[in-house]
């Protein structure tokens, strides 16, 4: 058992913050570093540092496994059965988990699914999470089809930013890859997000050879006049969705070959390397989970809709927080952070992810 030590600071003669670094050992001789930053007037900020020096300040929370689309790389063709309510986290448990994470230093929370906007009560849930003291950024990843209905409400509920999944600009190919749905619904959703006041919306585009590699330039062109960020993401060999093979895999380097005028901005945004067309209003992000693993900078943990805490996306290690109090959840999260591996295993056609779930059951 690991105990988070608490220090009270009643007076400080120096206006600058003091930083106390604690190293706490558990019975396995593993250790976790906890930075306690003490400010005047007893303000206290906790930062969790794992065994490999990574600051864990980001949590992805999947609130539902169900989706109104059936994307081939995310979900089995026949979809998934709706599970009994008692097997899933309750509204209150999701909020408690967010509170526990924030108490340990998480500052950014992302709501995912499935499709989070099909969850009953999603607006109230977002409002409750955004109201937690310490949440600096609340984001949501959505397929965008329901944003015409919900974008304004999400903004009012405190959601700061949206990522919208869109893998093709061709209506026929959209119908194929999603097995249902309408491209126009997503385009309307992107517009609704803009009207609602969301800025710097990110479009997540999974690169797939033989499917959308001929649309790379078209996606990049969307950034010329609009402040969007197109995020090209390498297809990962995960779950039982679309087959991953060498022909299907497209490295992000292909984007730079097809659009050589893209200029690097010299910095990264999380896991994305950022580029821009000269004079463009928006920008392009390249995310390389396969060709260039970024484990050394991993700052996140994941919580599935059925209450399983995943220290690593590509590991089948999971710890349940369902039915636990907020305090118990916090203890479990500390153990999960200690359990984060230094590196994931290899990812390629011969070495699929060890995640143990389809992406819709993890949170995309």
Predicted regions and their residues:
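Radical SAM/AdoMet-radical enzyme domain recognition
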Residues: 88-111, 118-233
């Amino acid at each position: 058992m690991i105990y988070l030590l608490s220090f009270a600071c009643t007076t400080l003669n120096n206006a600058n913050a003091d930083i106390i670094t604690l190293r706490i050992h558990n019975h396995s001789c593993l250790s976790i570093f906890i930075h306690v930053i003490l400010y005047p007037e007893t303000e206290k900020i906790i930062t969790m540092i794992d065994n490999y020096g990574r600051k864990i300040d980001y949590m992805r929370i999947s609130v539902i496994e169900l989706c109104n689309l059936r994307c081939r790389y995310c979900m089995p063709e026949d979809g998934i059965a709706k599970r009994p309510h008692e097997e899933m986290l309750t509204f209150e448990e999701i909020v408690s988990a967010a509170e526990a994470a924030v108490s340990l230093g998480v500052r950014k929370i992302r709501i995912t699914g499935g499709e989070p906007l099909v969850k009953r009560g999603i607006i109230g849930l977002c409002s409750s999470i955004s109201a937690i003291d310490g949440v600096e950024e609340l984001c949501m990843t959505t397929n965008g089809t329901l944003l015409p209905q919900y974008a304004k409400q999400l903004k009012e509920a405190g959601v700061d930013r949206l990522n919208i999944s869109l893998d093709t600009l061709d209506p026929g190919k959209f119908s194929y890859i999603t097995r249902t749905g309408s491209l126009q619904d997503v385009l309307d959703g992107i517009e609704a997000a803009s009207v609602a006041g969301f800025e710097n919306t990110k479009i997540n585009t999974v690169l797939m050879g033989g499917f959308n590699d001929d649309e790379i330039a078209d996606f990049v062109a969307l950034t010329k006049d609009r402040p969007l960020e197109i995020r090209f993401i390498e297809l990962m060999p995960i779950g039982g969705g679309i087959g991953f093979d060498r022909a299907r895999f497209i490295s992000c380097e292909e984007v730079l070959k097809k659009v050589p005028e893209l200029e690097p901005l010299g910095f990264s945004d999380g896991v994305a390397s950022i580029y821009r067309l000269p004079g463009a209003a928006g920008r392009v992000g390249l995310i390389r989970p396969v060709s260039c693993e970024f484990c050394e900078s991993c700052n996140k943990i994941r919580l599935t809709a059925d209450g399983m805490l995943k220290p690593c996306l590509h590991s089948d290690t999971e710890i349940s927080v369902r039915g636990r109090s907020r305090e118990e959840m916090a203890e479990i999260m500390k153990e999960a952070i200690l359990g984060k591996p230094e590196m994931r295993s290899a990812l390629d056609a011969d070495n699929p992810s060890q995640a143990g779930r389809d992406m819709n059951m993890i949170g995309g």
